[in-house]
Curated annotation (Swiss-Prot):
Keyword flag Signal: no
Family from the record: Belongs to the universal ribosomal protein uS8 family.
Superkingdom assignment: Eukaryota
Subcellular location: Plastid, Chloroplast
Keyword match Chloroplast: yes
Signal peptide interval: none
Protein source organism: Morus indica (Mulberry)
GO function term, MF aspect, one: structural constituent of ribosome
Protein name: Small ribosomal subunit protein uS8c
Keyword line: Chloroplast, Plastid, Ribonucleoprotein, Ribosomal protein, RNA-binding, rRNA-binding
Family matches, as InterPro entries: Ribosomal_uS8, Ribosomal_uS8_CS, Ribosomal_uS8_sf
GO CC annotations on file: chloroplast; ribonucleoprotein complex; ribosome
Amino acid sequence: MSKDTIANILTSIRNADMNKKRTVRIPYTNITENILKILLREGFIENMRKHQESNNLFFVLTLRHRRKRNRKGPDKTVLNLKRISRPGLRIYSNYQRIPRILGGMGIVILSTSRGIMTDREARLEGIGGEILCYIW
């Protein structure tokens, strides 16, 4: 595991989704908790619970499996997660230039002065911040 906790979250969820796993364990941090609450609220994950095992806190996520239909060949997952701002290259945006993912179908997760929030919430409040990731 690397020091980039957000990349670890996204990679764990992406790998579990690609391997058709129903649950995934993610180490607990405050940033992790805020991002997972957004994913739960937006419907990208089905359930989230906190679990403790010998002084180690972690989240157990239940993934929502949505598959593309009407395609020949194996099913592809619909969940896509992409890390944007990273420790070596921070990406910031004001509220007017926050990108729209798939015309508003996806979400952008931002870290603002008022906490971690989605692109829609940031536009409504009129604040920008660091673009953490895209999810569609």
